Amino acid sequence: EELEHEVQTHERCGKEVEYSVMKQWFIDIMNHKEDFLKIGNEIKWHPEHMHNRYDEWVNNVAWDWCISRQRYFGVPFPVWYCKDCGEPIFAKMEDLPVNPLVDSPKVDKCPKCGCSQFVPETDVMDTWATSSVTPLINMRYGEKDNYESFLKPMSLRTNASEIIRTWDFYTIVKSFYHFGQRPWDNVMISGFVMANKGEKISKSKGNSKVEPIDLINQYSADGIRYWAGSGRLGTDIVFSEETLLRGKKLINKIWNVSKFIEMHLADYEDKEFNDYEYIDKWILGSFQEMEKGFVKYLDEYEVGLALNHLEKFFWNFCDNYIEIVKHRLYRPEEFGDIPRYSGQKTVYTILYKLLQDFSIFFPFITEEIYQELYRDNKSIHLTEIKPLQFNFAKEIKNGDKIIDIISQARGEKSNNNLSLKTPIKVLELNVNEDLKEAINSSVKDFKATLFIEDLLLNNTNDDFKINKIELDLESK
């Protein structure tokens, strides 16, 4: 009798798919849900709310885990069955790996009925049944006699949110059954890459026309990593060529500023030095504070925030500090050899530290520059990131205000469609005592940066105010 009924079809090719009832292999889930919840509580989830997804899955799972599949590919079950009574014959651990379709069991007859003929298991394991043993593989489980004594939780598992219920959960299941403990200390969950409208990237939607190799050729591998590393923890990231372009611009700037610094290090010899100029103390102290936040973000697995934090400092370094110190580097006869060396030492130190921090995101360009300028180790990726140890809190505070004054004065030039090199005939400032001392300590740098002819500083209790700025309009 022919019956007409609805069946599911494959989403791509439309082929009908029907389920057949067959014997399968299962792992017991239902009797240990509380154990799996307990292990989940022992793990730190990043972001924390992703732990809720794990708990919801464990609490709501309603059946045991079927680990067998009827496919042509996969890891085979190391099992045979007695042809007469069906008794399963399992391979011993020392005999693994085996393929029962081509290998025979290491027994002559069935221990139950004595039959000497065996039928191989034809099923293969589910994807998650094999990928869930990754911690054991990393610890070379089964390859050493004392494997139980050296298995410890891994520090970190990284994956996207959709496989919390599969890869994460089933790895926890395996770890529980093997060792009764958590497989890792931390889980870092990423989001998905989405198309511009927040849609899933799919050929059928026509929103995935860009080939990866073309993107690499256009923006570089480091540029792709900039885009990939800019996302927030646990949050979807939109594919954006604008972000790729920003990454390319940043990488080009890293290269260009490195070449500028290299040009001024031709006669530089690295040695102990503490007689830094005021503005050098400002940038060194600012980097030290920035790197504390940078490391904090990394410790929290907020890679995107760490990159953004580092990038903001880099542009401040280029747009402000380099513009100030370049006069000292170019004109030692005017500024003096020691102030010039202070600038050399500072750019040498800051660039080295920037390359170390950026190397996490841009391994290729940072290695290229490192090999050209430093080479105190085989690779920048083998160097140890050590925090700077300065006490420049006062210089940071007042240095930021000096930069603010410089920015306002430059803005005045731009508003008048003047070159930034336009001389300032008179700059009159109201400043408090601390800032006055700071400006006087860096007066050569300050005046050279703004091309100031006459600088007047008046006392005030406030931070600062520009009273008068007289531009040389004849040089327009």
Residue ranges and their predicted role:
Residues 1, 109-119, 142-151, 175-186, ...:
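Secondary-structure transition/capping motifs at alpha-helix termini
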Residues 1-84, 167, 199, 207-250, ...:
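Residue patterns forming the tRNA-binding/recognition surfaces of aminoacyl-tRNA synthetases
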Residues 14, 190-191, 254, 317, ...:
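Residue-level signal for inorganic ion chemistry
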Residues 117-129, 148-165, 215-219, 243-253, ...:
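Secondary-structure capping and boundary motifs in well-ordered enzyme cores
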